[in-house]
Amino acid sequence: MVFTPSKEQEPAINDRQKDILVSASAGSGKTAVLVERVIQLMETGLSKDAKPSERPNIDDILMVTFTTDAAKNMRDRIRRRLVGATDEHMKAQVARLALANISTIHSFCEQLIKRYYYVIDLDPQFRLIDDAEQQLLKEQAWQATLDDWVANPDQVGALHQLIDNFGAGNLESVVQALDTEADAQPHPSDWLAGLSGLYQFEEGADPRQSAFFKRLLEPLVGPQLKELRDQWAALGEVGPARFAEQVEEDLAKLATTVDDQGHLLGSWDSLAQTLNKKNFAPKLRKRKDDDDPELLDELGVQRGGLRDQLGDLHDTYFFQSAADLVKYGQKAGALIEILTRVATDFRCHYQIIKQDRRLLDFSDLEHYAYAILTGENINPKVTWSDEEARAKRQAAAQVQAELQRHYKEIMIDEYQDTNRLQDDLLRLLHKSGQNHRFMVGDMKQSIYRFRQADPTLFKDYYDQFSADGQSSEALDLSDNYRSRHEVTDLVNLIFEQLMDQQLGEMVYDDKASLKPKADWGADRDQASPATPELLLFDGGVKKTTANPTGEDAIVVRQPEDKVASEVWLIGQRIRELLAKETILDPETKRVRPITPGDIAILSRAKRIHSVIAEQFAKLNLPVMVHGVENYFKATEIRVVMSLLKVIDNPYQDVPLAAVLRSPLIQVAPEVAAKFGLSQGENRIGFTEPELAYLKVNSTSKDFFGVVQQNYYAWRDQEVEAVENHDALTEEELAERVAGDPAGLATKEELGVNCGLIYLKLARFFELRDHLRRVAQRRPLVDLIWTIYQATGYLDYVGGMSGGPQRQANLHALYERASGYEESGFKGLYQFIHFIEQMQKKNDDLGEATTALAGDAINVMTIHKSKGLQFPIVFLVETTHQFQADRDPVTIEPQAGLGFTYVDSTANETMRVKHPLVQQAALKEKKKRQDRAEEMRLLYVALTRAEQRLFITGYVKDADLTKKMDKWNRAFDSASPLLTTTTRLKGQSMLDWIMMTLVRTANFPTLREGVEAAATPLRGLTKAAYQIKLQNADQVQAALNTPLDLHPNATAEQATPAAATSRQFKADLERVLNFTYPDQVATQTTAFQAVSTVREAFARQDPTNLEMGRLEIDRDQIKEAGAYLAPEERAFENPAFITGASDQEPTGTAIGTATHLVFQKLPLTEPLDEGAVRALIKSLTESGLIDNPQVAAGIDVAGVVSFYQTGLGQVITAHPEQVHREVPFSMLLSAHDLFSGIGATDDSEVLIHGIIDGYVQHDDQIDLFDYKTDRISQAHPEEDLQELADKYSGQLVLYADALTKMTGVPLEKIHRHLYFTRAKRVVTLSAPPSSHEPKEEA
């Protein structure tokens, strides 16, 4: 589809020769604008009067994105725009696209380091480490730091001061927090050294003159005090004369504290005295002559609230005299200087450990790249002389100048998530008058402050560029092409009342508000109503109805906890959507039923995800969970970790019980059947009665002793009772144990089968002993992979709910164990200890990522949803309270560090805690920053919705009345913007949402007495919405009520209630109990690989080939190797008989390796011999190619030549449509396939194979197959013809399989063979009705 920019977008695409910042609201098409600007720069040049020869190439433009996926998306979009270009310059860009710098900031820095490492004397042979490995190394660095300080008599006393103040346990976390913040600064050491500045005061000067007061305290307190003063003045305007006089007195006092601009007045001590609420008279007493005593009483209450707020300001910030502020500030400053010295030493140790092992973390990439451009020495092991330092700075200046000349424009996406180091780094690539910056972002979507992103950078640039307008400009994109107006109206209504500079760090004005521009077509009013819904589960109403009974009941128990209750409410609404309602298809804009893949559930935290997965499984709602509360709490990880603990030390009761109860211990179905059990009955894991039986039949105190005693007692008893005990199998032993009358009463009481218990015990000890041998002899990663293979657990979890995510988690555990060992750490015990330490710190290694599910409801955090959009969005758990700051220190990168000072010198037996004003001010600043982040998270969540928006929460009856009082505080403001105090009182997203809705005309009465306290406020954005409260009875009844489908619903979209109907159960039993009627056929040769029968396809009648039918005899089949009966098989003699050498690589091995190279080659990068050789080296080092002689036998030139052919060019032009190594299986009639060999009419042959590759484009498919056959130099054409005939039938089957897989007609599938040795493409069909091979050089 051709992109046509709007008038709003045109300046962002066409403006030249200036730095540009684009503030692009959600859904404004910023990616399309970025791509179009790149295309226009290459088409028209860097200036309006640029000559054709001056136009830049794609690799002259630096494009920095926030994520790897975003970079890939950008590259793909540019490629699609370039393909088909007619201009020679633009056509040339297709080939140059592989050279383009389109990457994340870290990838760009890595390229820079690998190219210019010599500037800073860095070893170029480094390896990047992940978060887990980083944490291990930091543990070592911290221990080394402590050892140094303890060993130094001059420092050990200072270390004790830190431990006295922060505690031994907290000190490490404080230092590591400082280290993390320092990493985001251009000059970490300078930043650390400046932290004590917040506590420095000039001798004899009032604290009001300090940097602390001017930079931190006044910006916080001044505006808030002015807001209080204004509210105070408004009270005096409506009250009686006596009250007005009191207010006048109050205002006279306040006038000495703050001016109209929010600047504080007077000295520190005068402010402390005036702001004390005791300085303001209490509430007026009623008098008989009062005209309106009720009004006076109400006004008195409001004034009392303002008086209390004033008192809070005093008690929070002005509780100390100026003298005490200076005194304790100096003591705290001295302690911070010690702390920063420890932090600096820690960073030095950590850096040395990494350099000794040639390791880099992600922050190193940025710092080393920055050093390359500045010539700074950041290597603690190297000291430069003055001459060396000067030479390094000159070399850095040359690199910087070279890059500035090379990059004609620097484009940065998601600039709001940039930190100060990244900002400085990118500015070094810019030179005024030589190149320009194009920065795109949206401060309203900056949600990564916890990763040291600084959204104020974007705001500063926006203000600066807006004021300039000449050499730079700021542009706004607020037109929304994503969402229906019902969604954007609600978003505007909420944020015009919530977001401003004081609490939100920006103003939500007309430039920031969303303007709906999405075209939903002519059917836009035919879909179900798109009014946003606020769904609240009322947990205060007790459940009164009995649980339903009968086979058709879905919900037979209502969960008591609020999280599960809210999930039932969500499930109920989704169930209704799937059964009854429609949306507009995002692509066709036609009305269609809603499918699970249309729905996304977004949450602030992961804690609700596991509950959703569990409860939705009961509702038969398909779900894909992207992220659980904690990686190590995922069931599959806990099971494997329990097994690792048991392998290390079996005398651990909880891990042992977890293993025994898990699917790791299984009895084969056919064995279980011999004990009268069905295939699924009690054969997977030990049941609770079985474990209880083991316990009561043992005298051991520890659980492993219980298990051992039962197993060996049974085994020894039964083995001794049999003469030929060597021939006794475990199954026979189990049968004897099952008949053993010992413990019969207990068996009958517990309902267990001793034979089955014995088999499970035997399986456990067999598995444990095998894995212990592996653990003793092989690396940790081999042990973990052996667990997966020996137990089949990796496959087992794949069949569970959220299977792909669970499998990804297990693969990630393997990878993390690999990283653990690569860091030099060894041993199972140490690995387990490391994991336990991570868990104690509430740290997490991060869950493995999975792709979005197209056929299931996607569940993810708001952070995960950034950059995505969905037709229907549920924002859930909005009543979850904002987190309070409980850290021992408060760090604000631009302000400083706050903590509580502990004085242990004043009294030998007592430690005195002194709260510091700096700590209070930093906590308040941090709180506001956190609230601003929560506000932006709410914005991101709401703007993911295209058509339907649902907001859910949980409230209780008693809490609802209290909450309504809080929400009604919105009426304290007579303007659309809520007061800062009101917004700060909001403890959850739901609080904020309800505060913004309560002043609208359509706010309903939630319950009797629970309603808006005043008349609606005029001037607010008009937005439709619904608020629904439902209790347990209502939700349960709805879930158990069968739903009538809308006329367009398919069977797959039927109500999930049908999933539990009698018919479904009958169908399920029929499937589970199904007996395959042709079991014997599975033991024949009806399973054939395409490669084993391809000879049978040679020189066939083309008509028969098209029909999938062959006329061949038995000898031909035998020659092809597809034997019909076991007695006719003739296997080749093994190498030890024939004497064949296993040193020389076979043609098959080389062919397999060549196919692997074709499969792994990145199609978006330059495909030359260097790239191929580098890939072969990588595959060899990783063990995928395990024989160097095989690697040497790969025809590198033959691989490269393929991509220089016409077919190869088609492939590289459509990399996203290329599919490689595609497996398939299909059933063909044996009678049709092998006519003439006596196959019965009802026999079928399962053909399986792997298609080397195909590319689907322009409604057709090019199917290609690589061949490494030898070609005679004397008769190459004859050989090619013969080989083409030989393989033609094989490609007919491939084409037939592709037709069934893709739906593309056979006549539109072109078949090609590529012979690597001849470097030739032979086209067998174009279309398949033409059977004359066509050759292409």
Curated annotation (Swiss-Prot):
Keyword DNA repair on entry: yes
Catalytic reaction annotation: Couples ATP hydrolysis with the unwinding of duplex DNA by translocating in the 3'-5' direction; ATP + H2O = ADP + phosphate + H(+)
The keyword Cell cycle is annotated on this UniProt entry: no
Record Pfam families: PDDEXK_1, UvrD-helicase, UvrD_C
GO process terms (BP): double-strand break repair via homologous recombination
GO CC field: cytosol; DNA helicase complex
Cofactor: Mg(2+)
Origin superkingdom: Bacteria
Binding-site residues for ATP, renumbered to this chain: 24-31
EC number(s) given by UniProt: 3.1.-.-, 5.6.2.4
Listed SUPFAM superfamilies: P-loop containing nucleoside triphosphate hydrolases, Restriction endonuclease-like
GO molecular function: 3'-5' DNA helicase activity; 3'-5' exonuclease activity; ATP binding; ATP hydrolysis activity; double-stranded DNA binding
Ranges of residues in domain UvrD-like helicase C-terminal: 522-867
Sorted UniProt keywords: ATP-binding, DNA damage, DNA repair, DNA-binding, Exonuclease, Helicase, Hydrolase, Isomerase, Nuclease, Nucleotide-binding
Family matches, as PANTHER family: ATP-DEPENDENT HELICASE_NUCLEASE SUBUNIT A, UVRD / RECB / PCRA DNA HELICASE FAMILY MEMBER
Job description of the protein: The heterodimer acts as both an ATP-dependent DNA helicase and an ATP-dependent, dual-direction single-stranded exonuclease. Recognizes the chi site generating a DNA molecule suitable for the initiation of homologous recombination. The AddA nuclease domain is required for chi fragment generation; this subunit has the helicase and 3' -> 5' nuclease activities.
Subunit note: Heterodimer of AddA and AddB/RexB.
Sequence similarity: Belongs to the helicase family. AddA subfamily.
Protein name: ATP-dependent helicase/nuclease subunit A
Originating organism: Limosilactobacillus fermentum (strain NBRC 3956 / LMG 18251)
Gene label: addA
